Amino acid sequence: MKRGESQAPDAIFGQSRAFALSDSSVNPDVIEYLKSVRQEALRTNAISIKNHMNLQKRTRHKSSMYDDEDEGALKRHAISPSLIRLQRNVEIWVRWFNSVKATVLTNAYEFTGYEDETLDLLLLFLKNYLEDMPSKCTTVEKIISVLNQHSFPEKAEEKEENLQIDEEWAKNILVRLEKTKIDSVEDVKKVITEGDKHELVGYNQWFQYLINNEPQHTTFHEKITSKQLWVLIKYMSNTWIKEIHKKGRHYRRLQDWLFYILVHTPERVTAEYTSILRDLGKKCLELIQKKPVEAHENKITLPKEMAELNVEIPAAVENMTITELTVSVIAVNYGQKDLIE
């Protein structure tokens, strides 16, 4: 290109060409190469514009690092009736629970061993229970025969009649007697006094134990260790709380056990255990909000031992459910109030 010649700016790219492609002095191979570069640039630019337009069409919401907080703020503007009910009653419910907990931990029976007189009465009760069974297997007949050889104290029958013993106790003792070789009264006494030393392992064993036994304060000193308590809380959170809320076959017994588990949960716990409790609280809250509580439906009842301790349910508490009590206790006593806010 001659020194005096100039090039008009490119209509698309807005730049002046470095030299005229029509100039005869330019190598034809260079011209072809530059044309291919131009076509590639045009194609790339067109794709970029198209993608940008598509992205604009798809974009409905621009993400923010504060999205979670924004959603939380929106939720707070629409509080469910079940959450309002919790907020209004939580302090009253937890205050009542704390008084019940103090009563159980202070006054409930805690087994420390049998006196001779008490053991004789238990043997007599067991003998009468076995004799009243409509059908008896060979093992039961043998146990009765062994017990008949024992010399019971005078007036033992009268005292035995006044002794309040749950037949469930006799059933459990019989199960263990059937697994033991019984040749003398001492063998029977040993089964009674040593208690059930079998350590429960896994979901099925614990489930069978809970549905077949009334919860008692002493159980948390004999059978349920501090470590096993947290295993039970996990089982409650994962499965049993659903059974309770939907009023399944064993919901009454499981409800009673949940009440006792809450009573025996330590007041000070580690961050790990707080997280386990929080999971249970969240599960309860989720169930409550899915199926709002109606008046007189699923209202809490007192386990047998609590009733015997003269624990009362005041009017302000009588329509509360165990799921509501659970989330309330976790929220207030374990610093998880955000669950109900």
From Swiss-Prot:
GO CC terms of this entry: small nuclear ribonucleoprotein complex; spliceosomal complex
Subcellular location: Nucleus
Record's function text: Involved in mRNA splicing. Required for snRNA accumulation and manufacture of snRNPs.
GO molecular function term, any single one: snRNA binding
Sequence similarity: Belongs to the BRR1 family.
UniProtKB keywords: mRNA processing, mRNA splicing, Nucleus, Spliceosome
Keyword match Cell wall biogenesis/degradation: no
GO BP annotations, alphabetical order: spliceosomal complex assembly; spliceosomal snRNP assembly
Record's subunit section: Interacts with HTA1 and associates with the spliceosome.
Primary site of residence: nucleus
Protein name as it appears in the record: Pre-mRNA-splicing factor BRR1
Top-level lineage group: Eukaryota
Miscellaneous information on this protein: Present with 1870 molecules/cell in log phase SD medium.
UniProt xrefs under Gene3D superfamilies: 1.20.58.1070
InterPro entries per record: Brr1 (IPR023251), Gemin2/Brr1 (IPR035426)
Record's keyword annotation contains Nucleus: yes
